[in-house]
Design a protein with these regions (language model features):
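Bacterial Sec-dependent N-terminal signal peptides
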Residues: 1-33
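Extended soluble regions of mature proteins
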Residues: 25-286
């Protein structure tokens, strides 16, 4: 009986270790994408609240331990969700480009993050704008022919409230659960901040979602600060973007994550395509 319990314990420990290893190294094999020139951005709303979320933080008090640092901007008429690390990099590269038209730049200007500078992943390079009951996702990809935008109704997660409470990020929170896009999620929300929003596509609870994660802990979003602001909300003109199906984007992102060398044509010293499979766990399974 003791042997059986120990065997199960070891198996569970190994499974959790594999999940954590994936979460800690989320999408670290694909290089940076072209910058987005912030000089071409336009104002579309005014933000009144900014909520900052750490993605897969090892230490919530150390931003250098995050895969990404993301911002939810709540405006008068719309919301925007985007990567601060990518925005910071685009801004620095835009300034550098004004004085250095050659197109070359220092690696120091690439997005920060625990994976190392300049590594693409879809949660960093997607910008979500919610308005009029829908979310429009603008996706930046390693291959520009797959860049575009797609619309979807504002997701209506079917949350189940639980009696569990805890202090999360300094807020008194209540726990809720849901099944969304093929994964089970747990969220901690606070009515101290009366906003029915959260990170990424999450929302619909009686208060701000402070922390949310999937059951396998591949993805964890945790609030680091909430700010009252009055600042313009900006977005790229996206003049060259075309509509693209969400399914097409998800299919491409699976291919490039599972075998980037094959899709991007990476070659070894002998000219052979470097084809190697890597496990990939997207946040959306359906």
């Amino acid at each position: 009986m003791i042997f059986f319990c120990m065997k199960n314990f070891i198996i569970i420990t190994l499974l959790l270790a594999n999940a954590m290893a994936f979460a800690q190294n989320k999408q670290s094999r694909i290089g940076y994408v072209a910058m987005s020139n912030t000089d071409n951005y336009v104002v579309f709303d005014t933000a009144t609240v900014r909520v900052w979320y750490a993605l897969n933080a090892l230490d919530i008090n150390d931003e250098n331990s995050y895969i990404d640092w993301q911002i939810l901007e709540v405006g008068k008429y719309s919301n925007k969700y985007y990567s601060y690390f990518v925005w910071e990099s685009d801004s620095l590269r835009t300034v550098d480009y004004r004085t250095n038209r050659s197109g070359s730049f220092s690696n120091k200007l690439l997005p920060r993050g625990r994976n190392g500078k300049g590594h693409w992943n879809e949660l960093q390079y997607h910008v979500l704008i919610a308005e009029n009951g829908k979310i429009r996702t603008y996706n930046r990809e390693r291959l520009p022919q797959y860049e575009g935008y797609y619309d979807e109704p504002y997701p209506n997660q079917q949350w189940t409230l639980t009696p569990d409470t805890a202090t999360v990020s300094g807020y008194h929170c209540q726990k809720a659960t849901c099944h969304f896009r093929g994964r089970d999620f747990e969220a901690w929300f606070t009515t101290d901040v009366p906003l029915k929003f959260g990170p990424w596509k999450f929302g619909g609870l009686p208060g701000l979602i402070v922390k949310v994660y999937d059951a396998d802990h591949y993805y964890t979003f945790e609030c680091t600060k909430v700010e009252r602001v009055h600042r313009p909300m900006v977005k790229s003109k996206y003049s060259r973007r075309r509509p693209i199906k969400r399914e097409t984007v998800l299919k491409f992102e699976r291919k490039i994550n599972e075998n980037p060398g094959k899709l991007l044509g990476w070659k070894d010293m002998e000219g052979n395509i470097i084809s190697k499979f890597y496990p990939y766990e997207p946040i959306e399974l359906e």
